[in-house]
Amino acid sequence: MVAGLREKPVDQIVACSQRLLMKLGAKGELLAFGPVVDGRFLAAHPSDIFDLKRAHTVDYLLGVGNHEYGFQLPSQYIRGFGRGITEDRFLLRMKKRMNAVYPMSVRLNGYVYSQQKSNLNNIAAAIRRVYREEYNPDDPHALEYQFTHAFGDQMFVAPTVLVASKHAAAGQRVYLYENQYAPSSAAAIRPDWVGCDHSDEAMMVSGAAFLDVPLKVGALLPFCSDDKRTSLSMMAYWANFARTGTLDCHPCRMKMYLFSIFLYPRNPSDRTGGPADSPMVPEWPQYTPDNPAYMKLDVTSSSDVGLKPEKMRLWNDVIPKLAASSKM
């Protein structure tokens, strides 16, 4: 089969991949990913592409929310979500996830993975050691809360940090963030224990807080003053990065070029066209191998170093080694 695929032209593989993803989506496989991104065929696993120094030379801005699997996704995929779980259920769900991530006889990051029961038990024990200090094993809701963090860390945070590290190690400029601000309209319809869910920052970056966003009931999506203030800051960062490819600046007034295009009239005395109330934003440090800095985006943003280091070590180093039956 592999020999036959190698004889196929890339265009045909790309077209077939798109059709395959559509079929999988129709069957409910919403998280199916093929070897094609934006119409380009990936000749190797993304991790190997980085290691082979074949990744594109581009500046990279990437990040996550502080509760990626907090509410939106588990509510869709887990029946009875929000009622609490037992510790056995916590570990069973993580085992099922690991069994899907490391299927039998697949080479990934230089390792060969198997579905051996002992491996899964060792992985579950490692997860429990890292996360157990943060939950009460006798509290079903605390267990479910910690499950959402463990699952989100594995699915979103660890891959993001891994890519940031590999791209920075290749000498590229990388800027990492953890979103810590949820729009008021989203927070109002979630339990109070949910943090910043998957894609919460999208509304802030897009300037939705300054637009009339209609709801199905005929009203407009409400936004508060903190929403608008945070949105201005995020748009300032993103607009500057889009224009210059960098966020390496001293605390200064960053003109909102993209924002001004659709909201503010041009000022003849100011060729940039930025609004008069462009926000003061703190410096966003570059992420490097020696200084894995990241920005904590909030009403008042601040920088820090090392995003969940113990948990990232678990997902990106400890578990891959535990899952490997042998190293190639």
Residue ranges and their predicted role:
Residues 4-228, 237, 258-265:
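Substrate-gating cap/lid region and adjacent catalytic-acid/histidine neighborhood
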Residues 40-41, 138, 142-144, 158, ...:
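Alpha/beta-hydrolase-fold serine-hydrolase catalytic core, especially in secreted/extracellular enzymes
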